[in-house]
Amino acid sequence: MRNRSRNLVLLALTLLAQPGNGLAADDFAAGRRIFLEKADCAYCHGWAGDGAGQGQSPGGAANLRASRLDRDSLIMVISCGIPGRAMPHFDDQAYTDRRCYGTTEAELGGRVPPFPPSTTLPRRDIELLADYLIAKVIGRGPLTREECMETLGERVRSCSDYPAITGP
C-alpha cells in the first residue's frame, strides 16, 4: 500500500510539472525560450504572439493568437518563411530544394523570404517552437491577465491591463 501511495504521488507530481497540454515541461521551456530569445519571434510577433512587435520591427506580423495554423503548417512557415513577406526562413537549406512550398529560390525569382538576421534553427528547435505555439499561443484569442502573469511574472503591473479569466 505504501508503494502504491508513493507511486500515485509521483504520478501526480509528474502531471503537475507538465504545462497542461501534453508537452513535457523541458520541451515547453525550450520552445518558449526559442520564441522569446533564440529566434526572437517576439521582436515582430510580440511577446504574447499578438502581432504587436517592438517598434523597430518591420510591422505587419501575424497575430498568432488568432491563427488557425496546425503543427505541420507552422513548421513549414517557421522553416520556410513566407515568400514576398517579411517573415524570415529559419531552415538554412530553405529553397535549395523543393522542401519549401514545392519550389526553389530560382523559381521564386528573388521573392525568397529574408534570411534570419542572426540565426537558423535545427529541425528539432523548429518542432519545439511549433509545439510551444500550439500549446500556448495559436488560437488562444485575446491575452488574459493570467497568461500575462504566467509569462512576465506576478509583479508586472501592465498585466492588470488585461482582462481576468471569468467563469463558473
Task: Mark where each language-model region is.
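Sec/Tat signal peptide C-region and signal peptidase I cleavage site
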Residues: 18-24
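Short, cysteine/histidine-rich loop/knuckle motifs that typically chelate Zn2+
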Residues: 43
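Short, non-ligating residues that shape and space the ligands of small metal-coordination modules
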Residues: 50-51
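Conserved catalytic-core motifs of eukaryotic protein kinase domains, centered on the activation segment
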Residues: 54-56
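Conserved beta-strand positions that form and line the central face of beta-propeller blades
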Residues: 63-64, 86
